[in-house]
Amino acid sequence: MGGSERDQFAAAVHDLLSGADVPAAARRWADGDLAPGLALWRRLAGLGVSALAVPEKWGGLGASPLDLVVACEELGHHALPGPVAESLAAVPALLAVLADTGLADTGLADTGLADTGLADTGLADTGLAPGACGERGLGGEWLAGLAAGDLIATLAMPPRLPFAADAGAARLVLLAEDGAVYRARLGAMHRSVDPARSLSEARGGEVLARDAAEAAARALDLGALACSAQLLGAGRALLEASVRHASVRAQFGRPVGAFQAVKHKLADVAIGLEFARPLLDAAATALGDDAATAGRDVSAAKVACADAAYRAARAALQVHGAIGYTAELDLSLWLAKVRALVPAWGSQAEHRARVMRELSGQGGPR
């Protein structure tokens, strides 16, 4: 997409989600009722959101990371529930390599979906019929399902991504660990600070690919990029909510937004968000170009977007006052989302250390 096309695409995603009651869907998702949220995912698939990171040869759009960033920013802006970075970015990147290079010699490549045992996880409900893999192979069928919006996937990538997010909504759960990719078996579930987000332990099952460290590293970077875009979008939403509230909440006979201290605080939030955007775009461009600096660029973007979103969350809570603490206020959905995504896909310390290593020429693990 060109610049104007991206703007139009972002506007289309924004309009779709603005016309839906996403906060209500997120609350029901947190209560275990996934139906409204999954309906939103299907509608977004109709716009091509789920096909962005899937190569054209597998039925996707083969879009650039910049296009993916545009979509994920809007999804974060509206606090869409579900494994956004996992299903829209990381899993397609990982499966694309598996589909091109072939699955590990486990017999999986020559079998239908029913033969893999995935029917027990609910994958049969996605419309990918048993034995339908044909010449495309299992990896290709999964990619086709992702592109069409028939399949939602998630993954764990220890140690940076120790848990699989929203595995209950996913019909495919992967584990990338120690250079191999597995079809994961789920373990214990853990609570997240975000009620609309669940975290599940993932254990290695059947091997899908060996010697996949390079593919996993790219998937990890693409996931971190998508998470950064979500954070930037969530930060924007929090700033907008703060400005609206500051214009109507009165103290001492004046809107609190008229006080210089509040103006400066919100201006600092706006500056932080705007300064993070060029780093996010640069990281997306570097990933799209397979630049040597892509890894550190992604880490720099993650740090900047997470810091900016966290600052927006703190300011929003302060501007809203005591009402900001209440779960009934929709603001809480974005506050929780930011708190959950800031440490996801690598902590701030890990990403800062990565930038320092690469700038100092020390290299080290990606």
Could you say what each language-model-derived stretch is?
Residues 1-78, 103-132, 221-366:
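Alpha-helical interface subdomain recognition
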Residues 17-20, 75, 90, 94, ...:
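Alpha-helix C-terminal capping segments
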Residues 53, 80-83, 152-154, 173:
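Short glycine-aspartate micro-motif
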Residues 65-68, 87, 139:
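Amphipathic alpha-helical segments in well-structured domains
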Residues 82-99:
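N-terminal glycine-rich flavin-associated loop
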Residues 96-97, 145-146, 286:
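Hydrophobic side-chain positions on well-ordered alpha-helices
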Residues 100-240, 244:
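FAD-binding core of flavoproteins
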